[in-house]
Amino acid sequence: MLKYCKKCVLPNTRPNIIFDKNQVCDGCSTSNQKSIEIDWQEREKNFSKLVDSIKNRSSFYDCLIPVSGGKDSTWQVLTALSYGLNPLCLTWKTPARNSLGEKNLQNLINLGVNHIDFSINPKVEKKFTLKTFEKFGIPLIPMHMAMHALTIQCAINFKIPLIIWGENSAFEYGGNDNTLKGFSLTHEWLKKYGVTNGTVSSDWIDNDLTEHDLRPYYWPSDKMQEDAGVQAIFLGHFFKWDPLQTFKIASENGFLKGEKPKTGHYNFADIDDEFLITIHHW
């Protein structure tokens, strides 16, 4: 039965969402926590301590930031730079990137960072996207797998100790992320909340897609990540996540909004992609 949150009207078709006895979603409950219960000054102090510990390591890059050029990743980069971190930025290049997305990504790079723009073999990407759409009605599974897998692969290969993600969607918008407390992104988190329908790259190996084809979508083992000393955090754990505020800060630093919304009501979200992101995953 279709239900809607009585506060925000988010439907129960969103994966992992939970409603309380008053039919209020856990995303709204989280909003109350952010406003009343969480000590954000203490969280920011914890981030400063983390930054200090990272700077004491001998890596050339202090952190890796997955970016699209959108308002949120622009804010992530600005925050990292304001703390004196030396980031490497990595982008999974959507096959549908538009001119506005290109401009905003270049604007992010011009903030003063090194950047890798990673394109996956288009023949593989096309096959994989079609398969996920036919099986689940979701063409975005390859996108989410690629964004997360390429990031951890790159951090391990470049010996970068810290990955800085944006918001924890399972905390901000609904999901029972009780064990991780919104702090870190792990393989366990990705499989449950990463919009992959609980699948991993090896689940999609068949006569059309080989293990070699799907290598960019492969998440290294927990042991490989642990041995490399790579930690992946959500910046939204340390700073109060507010899309309107990140939009304001990004706009003050060159980010351009769209002429009209691509999806929903906002012209500053999901505007870098011409068609793929507009096919919503729930």
Identify the function of each model-found stretch:
Residues 1-63, 79-282:
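Nucleotide-activated chemistry modules centered on ATP-dependent adenylation/adenylyltransferase
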Residues 63-72:
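Short, glycine-rich nucleotide/cofactor-binding loops
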Residues 75-77:
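Long, structured ligand/cofactor-binding scaffold of large enzymes
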